[in-house]
Every structure is written in C-alpha cells, then in structure tokens.
C-alpha cells in the first residue's frame, strides 16, 4: 500500500458516502462517483468527482478503472423507493450488479465494501443472539420499509455472490441507524432534537414507541471503513471461509427504543440548557395496533465481537453520547 492509493466511493455525494469520503481523503486519494456533485466543496479535500449513472455499466467501469478499492453506498431510500419503484430497482439492483461486475473485471481494483444495514434482520420479533449469521427477514418490517429492505438484502446477496466466485474481497458492513451531524432531516433523532430545541413536544407514536433501534455513530462508521480499506490494501483480509466471513455488524450493541430516544433527547436538552428548555413528551395514538411491547428490546442480544476483533477497536460510541454531541452542535449554531 502507498499513500497514493485511490478509493472510489459510489454514492459519495450522500450523507454516509460523503462522510466516508472526507475521512478517507486524509490518507488516500478519493474519487466520489455519483450522478450529482456533493453539496460540500470537494476542493477542500483530496477528492475528485466522476459523474456517473450507475444504471449504465460502461460509465461505472470507466469511473472505477483506476481505483484500488471501491466502496458502494448508493441506494434509493424511503420514501422515494415507494414512489418510484422502477427507479429503486434500477439503482439498487442493476446498479449494484454493475458496480460489482466493474470491480470483478478490473485488473486494478482489489476489492469492494458495501454499506449494509441492520434492517436486513427485520424489526419485529427479534429474539436470541443477533450476530452476522442471524439471517434475512424482509417480511418482519413495516410495509413502508419492505422495498428498501428487499433492496438492502439484494445488494448483500449480489456482493456476497461475487465474493464467493472471486479472489477479490467483496465485504459488507451492516450499519446501525447512523447518528451524526448532517444526517437526514426526517430521522426520528433529528426530528426530536429540532423540535426539542424549539421547545416543542417530542411526539413518539404509540404503536411504535417500544420499537428497539440499533444505532451507530458516524465517527465509528468512517473509522471502520478506513480500517477495512487498509486491510484490503495490505492483504490482511482472511479469504478462507464463506462470504459471511467478510460481513460485519457495525452497531452499538444496546438497543434503544423510540420512547427512550425521546427521553434521552429531552434530558440532554434540559441539561445542556441548564433547564431553560425542557421539552415535553406526548405520545401520539394513531389508532394503529402496537407492533412492540415494553420488553421487546430485552428479547434479543446483539453480538458484535466479530466486528470488534476484525477492526481491532475497543468499543463503539454509545448513542447517548452521539445525541449529546449533536445537541451541543445545534446549540452552538443557534448562538
């Protein structure tokens, strides 16, 4: 490996891809591969831009031809995937095939890492030990999330198939719901923080307030991808065993329910404002059947020991600290 290794980040204009790109540019040359340029200025970093519609194989192949490692973060998410199903299929399925095939054919690219998600496990009925081999349960999510989860499972399966038939690394890092500045506006965490800082009530829905969520801090995401990339470049990824050996669960192991999330945000805002702002929590009953019970989070245990060992890190940032740091940043912006 040299300091001039080139990392190509497909979908690098998005939140997670952009965060990874900026972090990796400290040690590598980075190329963002996306249909739109990032909203942040790539000239501030060691980053170039290659415009590409990943539905077009020739374009993908051209953009990836000179990279050493590829990271695939492109995805059509909720709610757009439900509004434009064909686009979701073409980007999430065909696009992923194109990225994997371009890596497969390239004499230069050493491997690929996919940003996966914990949602492939499903959300309801989690029980027992949840580790990398827990399995896929796309029918254990809300209807609005089904096509997204289908897509993330399909992306994993495509990547893992290439891993099984190639001598290159095709890895997956399944992420918890990512916490960090710049995260999508419509996430529960962002909504709670913004409403809370305005002194408005935090309004979890009654039917989902006990939903156990798995989170990860964006700082843990970027450092983990940095480590994984370096392992590929240094030939330190063990290639024996099935493709599951190259799959990692990157989540803080203690689940947090939506109600607990609201309570953490409320308490954090109250403490950091010295009691000047203490948002109320008001449960909203939409008349829907409850999907979870108060003890749902205690019915399963998350095992991330494989991830900790593979990455060589001691522990992950807990969600409570992530939220505290986010609230501090938002308060500074309001001064």
Per-range role (PLM):
Residues 54-91:
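NAD(P)H-binding glycine-rich loop region in Rossmannoid oxidoreductase-like domains
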Residues 75, 86, 90-97, 110, ...:
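Conserved internal alpha-helix in NAD(P)-dependent oxidoreductase domains
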Residues 45-56:
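Rossmann-fold cofactor-recognition segment
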Residues 6-26:
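N-terminal Rossmann NAD(P)H-binding glycine-rich loop of SDR-like oxidoreductase domains
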Residues 200, 204-335:
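C-terminal substrate-binding subdomain of Rossmann-fold SDR/epimerase-dehydratase oxidoreductases
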Residues 97-147:
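Conserved Rossmann-fold NAD(P)-dependent oxidoreductase catalytic core, especially the SDR/UDP-sugar
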Residues 147, 151-154:
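Active-site helix of classical SDR
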Residues 126-128, 157-230, 265:
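NAD(P)-dependent short-chain dehydrogenase/reductase
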């Amino acid at each position: 490996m040299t300091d001039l290794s080139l990392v190509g980040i497909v979908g690098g204009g998005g939140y997670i891809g952009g965060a990874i790109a900026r972090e990796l540019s400290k040690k590598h040359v980075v190329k963002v591969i996306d249909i739109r340029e990032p909203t942040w200025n790539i000239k501030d970093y060691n980053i170039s831009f290659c415009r590409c519609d990943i539905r077009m194989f020739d374009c993908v192949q051209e953009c990836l031809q000179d990279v050493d490692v590829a990271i695939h973060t492109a995805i059509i998410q909720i709610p757009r995937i439900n509004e434009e199903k064909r686009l979701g299929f073409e980007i999430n399925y065909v696009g992923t095939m194109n990225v994997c095939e371009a890596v497969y054919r390239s004499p230069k690219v050493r491997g690929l890492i996919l940003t996966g998600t914990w949602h492939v496990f499903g959300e309801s009925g989690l029980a027992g030990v949840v580790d990398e081999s827990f399995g896929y349960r796309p029918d254990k999510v809300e209807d609005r999330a089904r096509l997204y989860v289908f897509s993330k499972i399909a992306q994993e399966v495509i990547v893992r198939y290439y891993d099984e038939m190639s001598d290159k690394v095709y890895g997956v890092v399944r992420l918890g719901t990512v916490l960090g500045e710049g995260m999508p506006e419509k996430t529960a965490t962002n909504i709670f923080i913004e409403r809370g800082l305005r002194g408005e009530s935090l309004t979890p829905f009654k039917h989902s307030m006990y939903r156990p969520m798995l989170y990860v801090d964006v700082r843990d995401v970027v450092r983990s991808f940095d480590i994984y990339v370096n392992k590929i470049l240094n030939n330190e990824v063990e290639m024996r065993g099935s493709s599951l050996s190259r799959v990692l669960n990157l989540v803080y192991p203690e689940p947090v329910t939506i109600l607990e999330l609201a309570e953490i945000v409320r308490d954090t805002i109250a403490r950091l404002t010295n009691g000047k702002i203490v948002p109320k929590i008001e449960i909203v009953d939409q008349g829907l059947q409850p999907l979870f019970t108060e003890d749902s989070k205690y019915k399963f245990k998350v095992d991330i020991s494989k991830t900790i060992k593979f990455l060589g890190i001691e522990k992950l940032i807990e969600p409570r600290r992530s939220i505290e740091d986010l609230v501090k940043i938002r308060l500074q912006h309001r001064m």
